[in-house]
């Protein structure tokens, strides 16, 4: 018997077939570099930096930026940001720099140049007559890279969120060591003319390169990261959420995964912990793999590990975390089942802790405590395990163990308890729910049951 087939009759004729549905056609690509070559892009001819500065600044003022010219300028301006490498820097077997080396952002990558001239038009009226200073170059680089951050802010953010961010960024780049080079609100006005620039591969690459550099190298102009920080772990919301989750519940990754009681987690956990990746290596190319073009479709995004993502944020909702209530539900990844498991895990880790004495007045007190604890352990091991109290949680031993939680779920038939539903409704009803958020899902799903 083929387990995938169904049998039925059509006009008295027996039909046997295998139902097939549309599947995810995209290949998840891991970012490991196997050819020992630095990530690279190709740009037009390197410009005269003074001419390029004047052209790009005039375009910023006129809200008419040429993306090719901007990228060419950003790559050329990397020479202004020299710093000292604090330690030997390697990633995926590539030696980026030795300890003590003088490096600039373009030491991290390979930027190839063609002979094609840029436009370098002056679209913003008056031309700057003198040559720009380094602080002026740094301010222009910072403002241009901030267009990346602004273009990554989703439309779901309410009110004047994006405008407020743009205003704060402008304030940074008009304060020493930077210098004011544009009028107030210029950044937001220009952003509206290039709102999708985060999708331009070369611009994204340069933003990631600057961010990777300034995240490691101490530098006078490190505040440039304000516009590029969103390239770190970009499209890794699944992995980032899991990392935050295990810190929140104070377990190791291995201990936390033992609570994932659902077959749909198997493929996602395998995908998320593929061997050979530098997920735990500081300052690795891995952190910026998306912007550096090392992977077309991230295996670590919320969509790639949707069941894990949903579970983590249902637990977060149970604990009243605003970030989880605002996160977007992955509708195709069993949100109803994940909300049930999330309720049980939320109850398990909410308002409870495992505590023990760790600090003592002197060594004598420490030894006395350890002796007393050993005596308790010996007594527990000698116990025959007979259940003699209604308060015991189904069996003797660690009630917070995966076995204990699984037993409670089974005893309740895989359904949420009333107390779980009340908690879900309580946290979600007091929150202004965004469309398709976890708060909205919980409100719509459980309000009538509370």
Swiss-Prot record:
Listed GO CC annotations: helical viral capsid; host cell cytoplasm; ribonucleoprotein complex; viral nucleocapsid
Chain's role: Encapsidates the genome in a ratio of one protein N per nine ribonucleotides, protecting it from nucleases. If expressed without protein P it binds non-specifically RNA and therefore can bind it's own mRNA. Interaction with protein P abolishes any non-specific RNA binding, and prevents phosphorylation. The soluble N-P complex encapsidates specifically the genomic RNA, with protein N protecting the genome like a pearl necklace. The encapsidated genomic RNA is termed the nucleocapsid (NC) and serves as template for viral transcription and replication.
Note: Displays a superantigen activity in human and mouse, activating mostly V-beta-8 subtypes of T-cell receptor.
Family: Belongs to the lyssavirus nucleocapsid protein family.
Disulfide bond positions: none
Coiled coil: none
Keywords carried by this UniProt record: Capsid protein, Helical capsid protein, Host cytoplasm, Phosphoprotein, Ribonucleoprotein, RNA-binding, Superantigen, Viral nucleoprotein, Virion
Protein name: Nucleoprotein
Main location: virion
A UniProt-annotated Pfam family: Rhabdo_ncap
MF terms in GO: RNA binding
Sites of Phosphoserine modification: 389
Gene3D superfamilies, alphabetized: Nucleoprotein, Rhabdovirus nucleocapsid protein like domain
Subunit-level organization: Homomultimerizes to form the nucleocapsid. Binds to viral genomic RNA. In nucleocapsid, binds protein P and thereby positions the polymerase on the template. Protein P acts as a chaperone on free protein N to prevent it from aggregation before encapsidating genomic RNA.
Localization annotation: Virion; Host cytoplasm
Taxonomic superkingdom: Viruses
InterPro entries reported for this sequence: Rhabdo_ncapsid, Rhabdovirus_ncapsid_C, Rhabdovirus_ncapsid_N, Rhabdovirus_nucleoprotein-like
PTM note: Phosphorylated by host CK2. Unphosphorylated protein N seems to have a better affinity for leader viral promoter encapsidation. Phosphorylation of protein N in ribonucleocapsid may stabilize the interaction with protein P, thereby playing an important role in viral transcription/replication.
Protein species of origin: Rabies virus (isolate Skunk/Ontario/1991) (RABV)
